């Protein structure tokens, strides 16, 4: 009880950082020191800390399409942010080079909204790019990694990074509930030392009580059990939604683009109607879908007739 009334260091309470390190070791194959882990109230807060740590003189590039909020946060922190187009393997390394970027913000395990899982060869290409200059880093947002429905999760880029070029970010908001604003990042050792040297005046934005509660939830095995239950639950929901779609459309009318991970997939209609018209007609039937083009930072010339299904 007394510990909960004591203000801990800015990175978060030791017990939670140790629990996270143990979880990452068993679940993601990552060997990290608890002192490399920084806990914060949401990934948005951590993105802001990263800009302060890495500097506003860098060019930050983000995936296009992708979460628009990420670029908005960088820009609000006075950092130059450029969208970089993706191909079928993920963000284009050649376009990152053309943008003269120093920081690449990516979601290689399960990209939103395309669902692309970056193959190993592209991951090594990104690491090679980062290793070409001392001021280059990869921010690996491990979005939705807990919810891989088949097989083992693909190891993160950090697990193959031998030169301290990857900053790993994840959150408990997706795996537990959005009202739990607890996220964390894993910094390379030299950046963690720099963080505590320059930014240790920041207080941890997560309450001590919540940190100790989550630490016990993880260390006593409840988090792993919860994830396993949720995988089964969402796996059943996924199959139910897929069965409904296949029962309503032929393969020519509607193609399902799915991935083994994440809580969404994409359907593509064989139609000449504008995406907006399709959205409006479906909404009249009580079905709310978003076209994938809503998530493009640079507006595409043509509609893709692809829509996101969340479940």
Task: Identify what each model region corresponds to.
Residues 2-6:
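Short, small-residue-biased leader/transition segments that mark boundaries at the very start
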Residues 196-199, 220-242:
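Structural signature of PLP-dependent enzymes
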Residues 232-242, 254-268, 278-280:
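Conserved glycine-rich beta-strand-loop-beta hairpin in the small C-terminal domain of fold type I
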